[in-house]
């Protein structure tokens, strides 16, 4: 991923009111002259807007003015690997509307007014790797990938206790405590090594293995933040499925201090940190469209009318609801 800042200014169409069209125009003009032959544009994130020289306006829609200026951070990636992913989605019957970085989604999940004014970092512990991103006033300025993730914990448990990977994952998610000092030596777990052999482990032993790997991972992420920036970090958010481990927040506090905290998604139905990138990406996409005065809906206007009509038959409404949920749940 490559990022750099550009600046552009355009004349406003109607002095009496700046609209989403004006914002689209200034952002599109900012991209003119950029070399996208080898790289694909992923995001054009406006830092701020200026109306007739007035600075630090986040959303100028509705204001009066003759000129609109912006500073934009653009992010690009190599075309070839991205196009391979898009081709797989196309063959799967999935329409690609837009592309984004998962780190943007993580930020929009935890985004608030305080974070929009300072420098901070977000750590997402994935299955195969850990993503470390640094944000300045809500704009991603640095990003790095550590090739260690939650699956490494599963492999450690498999190596130590001779369990298969599936059983190791259950041990990690349902039995282990991230901080072994909080574990109970009297709490045990039984599992089969093969059809004739069973094994019993206690919570302290399992938790020590988990803690060792998770602590190492957090130290790697901490060092990576230092490598990415020398600015003062005002917040650190840790997310990803592994952050749901029992006692994880205590381990985070030991490694980072009170500057760090674990993501806490409160939205009903997705109260798990494994969804942070997906949930935040939806919010980011909606915010992006709102700034440009645009809207996107997965449901057609006809279906909306059927769903809201009091004259519709119950069966019709049920069909529409099924269609809506069909976008998210497939048998």
Predicted regions and their residues:
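Glycine-rich phosphate-binding/hydrolytic loop that grips phosphoryl groups
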Residues: 264-307
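Short, solvent-exposed amphipathic alpha-helical segments in soluble enzyme
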Residues: 115, 252-257
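Gly/Thr-rich phosphate-binding beta-strand-loop-beta motif of the actin/hexokinase/Hsp70
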Residues: 1, 112-142, 157
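Glycine-rich phosphate-binding loops at beta-strand->alpha-helix junctions
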Residues: 177-179, 232-252
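A conserved active-site cap/scaffold subdomain adjacent to cofactor or substrate pockets
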Residues: 147-169
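Phosphate/pyrophosphate-binding loops at sites that engage ATP/ADP/AMP, CoA/4′-phosphopantetheine
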Residues: 218, 222-235
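Nucleotide/phosphate-binding catalytic cleft detector across ATP-hydrolyzing
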Residues: 1-121, 164, 178-186, 193-196, ...
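Residue-level signature of catalytic and energy-coupling elements of molecular machines
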Residues: 89, 157, 221, 238, ...
